């Protein structure tokens, strides 16, 4: 365990110890399961849910994260509605009733939404703003690509339109100013993109709803197809988007956790089943207490 803590892949640990990797996994899994049994999740009220793949193009696992403690409390196979049931059942086994979870943060996945409303009916959903902005940026880039078909000079300027303006170099800033003047549709799309992000600074829900209503009206007037599609998505997920201005929760914490999940993939290289991978996630992201020999705090 001490060697694995030093960011060493399990296969390398087995090589150093002169044992079969499966023996290392057996010992590793024993201590993870023991720590899981005593893991205290009694204070959780705000839950984040996100999925990641165990390998590129392979099986998915869903992470349940305590957003206040910034740690993974449960991992299960799959990425659909049933994963929310799995998380709920884990919490209930730990003595946490479903109504203790008052806030849920997730992407706009229909299966996650179905799971949340079924298994955590008392929780208010906040759709992760970073996922919403990702969809907005995809709409912006779709407009650029459509314009690029007739204007080659727009090639290579994806991030000129996606980055925050203050983060552009002087050269890119000049190019942006020129392009939004030369191409009115692109300029209007960029204006709408920048304007949308004012939503996150609204003081309360009524203000957010009024702002978003006006923004959707402007999109309708602009008649830019990609933005009309995005606005349709916004309307379909309205309450969970505007709820951000009250909850201020995101899955941003999961970005840091996901970097550790990538590390888990490297350390678990050669794992024979998804159970080993899941336990490596607990080890790196669960902030659990272990009492194995030579464990240092």
Regions inferred by a protein language model and the residue ranges of each:
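Acidic-residue sensor for enzyme active/binding pockets
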Residues: 51, 147, 255
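Short, surface-exposed amphipathic charged segments that create phosphate/polyanion-binding patches used
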Residues: 62, 137-148
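Short, positively charged, Gly/Tyr-enriched micro-motifs
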Residues: 1-58, 99, 111, 241-242
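Acidic/histidine-rich catalytic cores and adjacent linkers
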Residues: 56-58, 66-70, 77, 85, ...
């Amino acid at each position: 365990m001490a060697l694995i803590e030093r960011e060493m892949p399990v296969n390398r640990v087995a090589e150093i110890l002169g044992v079969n990797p499966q023996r290392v996994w057996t010992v590793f899994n024993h201590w993870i399961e023991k720590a899981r049994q005593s893991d205290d999740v009694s204070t959780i009220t705000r839950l984040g849910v996100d999925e990641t793949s165990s390998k590129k193009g392979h099986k998915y696992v869903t992470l349940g994260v305590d957003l206040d403690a910034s740690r993974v409390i449960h991992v299960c196979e799959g990425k659909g509605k049933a994963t929310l049931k799995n998380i709920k059942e884990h919490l209930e086994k730990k003595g946490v009733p479903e109504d203790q979870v008052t806030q849920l943060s997730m992407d706009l996945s229909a299966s996650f939404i179905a799971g949340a409303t079924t298994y955590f009916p008392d929780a208010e959903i906040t759709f992760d703003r970073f996922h919403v902005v990702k969809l907005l940026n995809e709409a912006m880039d779709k407009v650029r690509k459509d314009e690029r078909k007739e204007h080659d000079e727009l090639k290579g300027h994806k991030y000129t339109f996606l980055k925050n303006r203050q983060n552009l170099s002087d050269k890119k800033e000049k190019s942006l100013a020129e392009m939004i003047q030369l191409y009115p549709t692109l300029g209007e799309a960029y204006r709408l993109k920048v304007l949308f992000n004012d939503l996150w600074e609204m003081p309360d829900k009524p203000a957010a709803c009024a702002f978003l209503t006006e923004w959707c009206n402007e999109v309708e007037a602009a008649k830019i197809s990609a933005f009309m599609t995005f606005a349709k998505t916004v309307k379909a997920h309205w309450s969970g988007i505007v709820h951000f201005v009250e909850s201020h929760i995101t899955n941003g914490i999961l970005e840091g956790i996901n970097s550790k999940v990538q590390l888990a993939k490297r350390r678990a290289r050669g794992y024979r089943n998804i159970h080993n991978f899941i336990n490596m996630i607990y080890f790196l992201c669960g902030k659990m207490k272990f009492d194995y020999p030579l464990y240092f705090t």
